[in-house]
Structures are given as structure tokens and as C-alpha cells.
């Protein structure tokens, strides 16, 4: 093991150890990481007061009365982190930190980037040109057909699909990707140990067995929430070269992803059927964006597929005005 590998192995153990402490949650660890403090250095500290204050937890009184007690506490905590790290390593779960070369460059440049990623499966997929395919949980037959068309058009083109493993369009994007041999990445809104939504275990197993990847920034044991899903959507948009909202409403979770795509200067692509209302809010949200393109299918299927493979807009790439208010899109970690 190289010195660099040993460094990040220790950081991973420390990260697992700290999140095992009662009262230590995502926001606390995120703030620590943003400030540039390394987790292993925090565990090494000789000052229990600094340790407790930084993590916003109350330590047992005995720890402050004896150096031996403090050292024993740290040794036990490190052993706990080592055990957790070993457990997740056995199921091919890695932690990739923001400062590592293995961290996706596309996510380093977004607003409020993840400071770490739990990655299960093929890490290479996070460094390959990818297309986020997103949409309604209550999809129609038309939505499923459009999803199949898009993914089939991505086959054998060196692209990766990205979605959120949710019911509806998301799961169909993963399933069609598996069918057509397109590597697929599922971004979770929960901890890596959680199977959500209920019944998604089979799709998740298929994703991994076919060379895909499961990704989340959330901690072990962390459950879902509406706020978490909005934050998850920024990772979908950030990781992708192009974002394709297949079937959605302007007031929906998918709309958050659309607006993140605009914030991050990604391409937005939307296929539509001949009977669609071109004045509808959803299509207008795409056409009003300088890097947005819509395609009527089946007539423009070839143009759609070619654009997905090689997106190009011969216009200025100025940042557009987003469609949702700041309050509706708020993702701040309240640091």
C-alpha cells in the first residue's frame, strides 16, 4: 500500500468511526469537511473538549478526568471505524473524498458539492460521459416508451446513464440500460445500506452485476426525506453531461433537477410526441434555456440520438434564469 493509499484508508476509517457516534450527523460532518479539517486528525486530537465541540456532542465526564480514559475512547472509536470499513469493503463499497483524484471532476465544480461519495460497483462510470434520465414516479406508457427509445439510442456509444432508482421513469431508465448494455449509475437519497424505494433490491442487484454503480453522499443508516431527495438531484445533474427529463411537471422533484442542470450549465434535452402541447410549461422550460433542445419523435429520432452522443449548441453559454424560486430550490446545508 502506498503512502497516499494509507492516508485515504485512515481517513475512511476515521469517517466511519465519527459517523458511528450518537448525535453526529450529516450536516456536522459536512461542515467539518468544508472547513478543511481531516477526520483522522480530529480523532488524533489530544483535546477532548475540542473533539466534542467540533462534533457538537457531549462526551462522558470521565474522559476529561483521565488521559488514559481519553486514549481508550479513541482506540475503541478507531476499532469501531475499522470494523465498519471492513464490513462495507466486503460488499465493494468505497468512500471517495472530494480531494482524491478518484472523485469525479464534474462534481467538484458545482455549487455545494458533495464532500464524499459512497460508491458501490464500478468507479470508472463516474468518470465517463453520462446522461441523466429522469422523470415522474407515476409514469405513463408514453413515458416508458420514450425512456426505452432514449436508452436504446445510447447503446454502443460509450455513454453511461444516470438516474435515481425511484419508481417510474428512474427505474425504467436503469432497467432499459441493463437490457441494452449501457452502464448505469443510481444516485440514492438514502444511506448506501438502505434499499429505497421498497422493492428496488432486484434492480439494484442487476445494476451492480451488469457493471453499474450505486452512489450516495448520505451516511450509513441515514433515511430518506424530501430535502435529501432535492440534494440528491443536484448530484444527478452535476454528474451528467446532459439531463433528459422524459415525463415531468413544472412543480415536481424533476423540476429541481432541471434547474440544477441550468445552474451547472449542463445540456437539457426533452423528447416529445406529436400530440404534445408546445406551449406547455415543461417544454417551454427547456426551449427558453440556451443549452436546451427538444425533439419530436419519432420524426426527429436520429437528431435526438446524435445530439445525445455529441451535444452542441451554437449559442452563448450564459447562465439562464431558473424557473423555481430560491425558496423552492433551497438545498443549503445550513452551515
Feature names for model-found ranges:
Residues 2-9, 98-335:
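Glycine-biased, small-residue-rich flexible motifs in mid-sequence functional cores and linkers
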Residues 1-99, 287:
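Short, small/acidic-rich helices and loops at N termini and domain boundaries
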Amino acid at each position: 500500500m502506498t503512502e497516499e493509499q494509507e492516508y485515504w484508508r485512515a481517513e475512511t476509517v476515521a469517517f466511519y468511526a465519527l459517523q458511528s457516534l450518537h448525535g453526529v450527523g450529516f450536516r456536522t460532518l459536512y461542515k467539518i469537511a468544508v472547513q478543511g479539517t481531516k477526520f483522522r486528525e480530529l480523532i488524533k486530537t489530544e483535546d477532548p473538549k475540542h473533539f466534542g465541540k467540533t462534533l457538537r456532542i457531549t462526551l462522558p465526564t470521565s474522559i476529561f478526568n483521565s488521559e488514559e480514559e481519553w486514549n481508550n475512547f479513541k482506540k475503541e472509536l478507531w476499532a469501531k471505524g475499522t470494523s465498519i470499513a471492513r464490513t462495507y469493503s466486503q460488499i465493494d463499497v468505497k468512500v471517495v473524498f472530494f480531494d482524491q483524484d478518484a472523485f469525479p471532476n464534474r462534481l467538484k465544480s458545482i455549487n455545494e458539492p458533495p464532500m464524499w461519495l459512497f460508491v458501490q460497483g464500478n468507479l470508472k462510470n463516474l468518470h465517463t460521459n453520462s446522461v441523466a434520465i429522469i422523470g415522474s414516479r407515476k409514469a405513463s406508457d408514453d413515458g416508458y416508451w420514450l425512456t426505452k427509445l432514449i436508452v436504446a439510442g445510447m447503446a454502443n456509444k460509450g455513454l453511461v446513464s444516470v438516474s435515481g432508482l425511484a419508481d417510474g421513469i428512474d427505474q425504467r431508465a436503469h432497467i432499459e440500460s441493463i437490457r441494452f448494455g449501457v452502464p448505469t449509475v443510481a444516485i440514492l437519497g438514502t444511506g448506501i445500506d438502505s434499499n429505497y424505494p421498497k422493492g428496488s433490491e432486484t434492480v439494484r442487484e442487476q445494476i451492480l452485476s451488469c457493471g453499474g454503480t450505486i452512489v450516495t453522499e448520505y451516511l450509513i443508516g441515514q433515511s430518506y426525506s424530501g430535502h435529501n431527495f432535492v440534494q440528491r438531484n443536484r448530484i444527478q445533474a452535476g454528474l451528467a453531461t446532459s439531463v433528459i427529463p422524459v415525463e415531468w411537471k413544472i412543480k415536481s422533484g424533476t423540476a429541481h433537477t432541471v434547474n440544477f442542470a441550468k445552474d451547472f450549465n449542463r445540456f437539457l434535452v426533452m423528447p416529445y410526441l406529436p400530440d404534445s402541447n408546445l406551449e406547455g410549461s415543461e417544454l417551454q422550460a427547456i426551449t427558453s434555456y440556451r443549452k436546451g433542445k427538444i425533439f419530436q419523435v419519432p420524426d426527429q429520432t436520429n437528431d435526438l440520438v446524435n445530439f445525445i452522443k455529441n451535444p452542441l449548441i451554437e449559442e452563448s453559454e450564459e447562465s439562464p434564469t431558473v424557473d423555481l424560486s430560491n425558496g423552492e430550490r433551497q438545498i443549503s446545508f445550513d452551515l
